[in-house]
Structures are given as C-alpha cells and as structure tokens.
C-alpha cells in the first residue's frame, strides 16, 4: 500500500453463495486517494468485493473498515460510498441536471447548494452545456459521464466502478480511461475499479489486485504485476507469455543459476531459491525474445532453434510464431518499422532464438 494512509480495509472477509465460495479470506488495504483496480476473470469475486464494501452484500466472515470504522453492519447510505454500475442506471424521464441532483435532493440539500454542486460536477465531466437533455439524447460516453457526475457530486470518501466501460466501443473506452484517471487525480477521491481487461487496469491504476476463484493472487503496481508475476495464472492473465520447462543444474557465487532448457544450458537470474534437479517454469514475454538467422553470432551463446511458422501484422508490432525443433511454439513480438528489412521473415525460414538476459521470470514448476 502507498504511504497515504488506509481508507478501506477488508479483514479476513469470506462470502459463500449456496455452494460457491465467492470470497475466500480476503485481506486488502486501500490507500486514501488511491486508484485501485480489481482484475480477474468472470466469477472471480471482484464484483462481490465491491458489493460488500458498498453494503449491498454482507460478508459471512470478516470485517470492513472505512476510515477506521467497522461498517460491517451499516446500510449503504451510511458508508459515504457511491457506485457507478455497468448500465449507469440513469432515470430516463429526468434531465441530466435532475439525474445528477437526485441524491442531493434526497439528502434535503438546500436548492442553491444543489445547483452549485451539480454545475460543478457537470463541468468536471464536460457536460455543463447538456444539463437540460434527457439520457436518450446522449451518446453512450455522455451517459457514462452523467453517471460519474452523479456519483461524485456529494464528494464521497470512496467511488466504486463496476466495469463501467463494458458497453462502450474500443476507441471510446480509451478516451474514458484517460478522463476517469484525470478526474480521480483532480478530485483526490479513492477509486476502486472492477474490470477483466488487463490493458484497462494497467492504464488507470496505482495498484492492481489480480483475483482468481475468490482469492487474491497478487497485489502490486501494473509494472510489478506484468514483469514479476508470482505464478502462471497471473503471468497468463495479464498478457501473452511463453512457458519453457527447465531443470536447475547449479548456482554460482553471484546467485546466477544454470538450467537445462530443451537441449541447451541457459543462465537464469531470479530472486527465488532453487535446488539442483528442481523443475522450473521459465516465463518469457514475447517482446523479450530475440530472433537471429542461423549464421549470426548468436550461435556462440545458448539458444533454441526453430522455423518461422507464421507472422501476424498488428500495426505497431508484428507477432512471429516460431515452431521449435524440440517441440512447442514461441510467440515473439517485434516493433514494426517499414524501413527495417530485418523484420521480414519467410514462412519456413530457419532461425535461432534467445532472450534479453535477466528478463526471464523463473517460478517453481506448475502444470501448464
């Protein structure tokens, strides 16, 4: 957690629905002013955490603390927490202004104060000129902004966002990601965001919580999660990964291991401790692998051999699929430069592959 002080804490929280364990002993601290994302596949428990924080669900075991107060038995209206849902839940018969003002009026806020706060909220989301329109007269992105304005107008301690971009197209999602991140920084409110989209999580978050089957697999910065995954599930969920099976042979005085991978011996750098003979997974991101022709200097260093099976042009990058002589394939990503002839590979061409020294992730063996 960052050094800003804890605003939300979940202590030993568990929740069971019928025969399904939705949350299994969750412990999580969220810093004041932090943008934290719960990332994981459908059914992993991330939305259940949101509902428990907001008060729409009650944990079977554990406590929820907001600003140091145990709110486990508090109803939603006493928690100073607002939620933006997937489908916005705007009132179709009300104007934008009235939608944003609804909560303030329910709280008996004075009319002048309501008008002031509503205008401020709409201005922050660039909709001050749309106050008299109805939701049906707005685009999907504009409806999204109205929902966010309504959620922040009363300045809650915490804003929860449950996959709010799911109904938007890819380009609009990217625009909204930047707008939400900027708005959160401006407001200083703690945001807890739920998504199954790794790129979305990485683009917006101070920290990411990767979840699977009701458990937290890893918590860290986007860079830490991507570059230092703690297990195969995390490595695969947050991007493309190549998995090579290896066996530890030895370790020198500098802590560099030697491992047998296929028919070669490779040096491996890792903070983990292994014993000779131990099986490991050597994980490589596609962008960390290098391709060479067989007559190049790479033949003097450890490498694997194979042939080009397929190339996939993606605009900024080209994906190259290599069928290894020892079996299996590697996916390699190279940045595309139309002036660079070296990125042109022919199907069936023989190549050697190695990787950037020290960029491998070495983990205890798990079944693939």
UniProtKB/Swiss-Prot annotation:
Q: Which GO terms describe its molecular function?
A: ABC-type putrescine transporter activity; ATP binding; ATP hydrolysis activity
Q: Tell me how this protein sits in the membrane.
A: Peripheral membrane protein
Q: Which Gene3D superfamilies match?
A: 2.40.50.100, P-loop containing nucleotide triphosphate hydrolases (3.40.50.300)
Q: Which residues form the ABC transporter domain?
A: 8-238
Where is the protein found, in the record's own terms?
Cell membrane
Q: Name one GO cellular component term.
A: ATP-binding cassette (ABC) transporter complex
Question: Where, by residue number, does ATP bind?
Answer: 40-47
Say if the entry is tagged with keyword Transmembrane.
Answer: no
InterPro entries xrefs: AAA+_ATPase, ABC_SmlMolc_Importer, ABC_transporter-like_ATP-bd, ABC_transporter-like_CS, Mo/tungstate-bd_C_term_dom, P-loop_NTPase, PotA-like, PotA_ATP-bd
Show the Pfam families listed in the entry. ABC_tran, TOBE_2
State its Enzyme Commission number(s).
7.6.2.11
SMART domains documented for this protein: AAA
The reaction(s) this protein catalyses? ATP + H2O + polyamine-[polyamine-binding protein]Side 1 = ADP + phosphate + polyamineSide 2 + [polyamine-binding protein]Side 1
The UniProt entry's sequence similarity note says: Belongs to the ABC transporter superfamily. Spermidine/putrescine importer (TC 3.A.1.11.1) family.
Known NCBIfam families for this protein? potA, PRK09452.1
Function statement: Part of the ABC transporter complex PotABCD involved in spermidine/putrescine import. Responsible for energy coupling to the transport system.
Q: What is this protein called?
A: Spermidine/putrescine import ATP-binding protein PotA
Q: Which organism is it from?
A: Lawsonia intracellularis (strain PHE/MN1-00)
């Amino acid at each position: 957690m960052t050094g800003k002080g804890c605003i939300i804490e979940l202590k030993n929280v568990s929740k069971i629905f019928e025969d399904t364990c939705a949350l299994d002993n969750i412990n999580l601290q969220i810093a004041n002013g932090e943008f934290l994302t719960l990332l994981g596949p459908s059914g992993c428990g991330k939305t259940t955490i949101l509902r428990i924080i907001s008060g729409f669900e009650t944990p079977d075991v554990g406590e929820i603390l907001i600003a140091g107060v145990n709110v486990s038995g508090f109803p939603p209206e006493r928690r100073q927490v607002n939620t933006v849902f997937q489908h916005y839940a705007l009132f179709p018969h009300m104007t934008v202004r009235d939608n944003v003002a609804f909560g303030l009026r329910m709280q008996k806020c004075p009319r002048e104060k309501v008008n002031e706060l509503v205008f401020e909220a709409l201005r922050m989301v660039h909709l001050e000129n749309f106050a008299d329109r109805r939701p049906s007269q707005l685009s999907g992105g504009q409806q999204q902004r109205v929902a966010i304005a309504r959620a922040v107008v009363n300045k809650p301690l915490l804003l929860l966002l449950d996959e709010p971009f799911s109904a938007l197209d890819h380009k609009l999602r990217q625009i909204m990601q930047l707008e939400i991140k900027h708005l959160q920084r401006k407001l200083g409110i703690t945001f807890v965001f739920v998504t199954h989209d790794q790129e979305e999580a990485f683009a917006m978050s101070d920290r990411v919580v990767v979840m699977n089957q009701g458990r937290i697999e890893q918590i860290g910065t986007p860079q830490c999660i991507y570059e230092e995954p703690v297990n195969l599930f995390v490595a695969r969920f947050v991007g493309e990964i190549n998995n090579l099976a290896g066996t530890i042979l030895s370790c020198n005085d500098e802590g560099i291991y030697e491992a047998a991978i296929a028919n070669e011996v490779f040096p491996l750098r890792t903070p983990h401790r292994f014993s000779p003979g131990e099986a490991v997974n050597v994980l490589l991101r596609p962008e960390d692998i290098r391709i060479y022709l067989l007559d190049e200097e790479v033949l003097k260093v450890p490498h694997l051999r194979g042939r080009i099976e397929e190339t996939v042009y993606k605009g900024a990058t080209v994906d190259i699929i290599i069928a290894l002589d020892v079996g299996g394939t590697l996916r390699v990503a190279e940045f595309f430069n139309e002036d660079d002839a070296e990125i042109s590979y022919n199907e069936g061409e023989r190549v050697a592959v190695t990787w950037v020294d020290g960029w491998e992730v070495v983990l205890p063996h798990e079944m693939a």
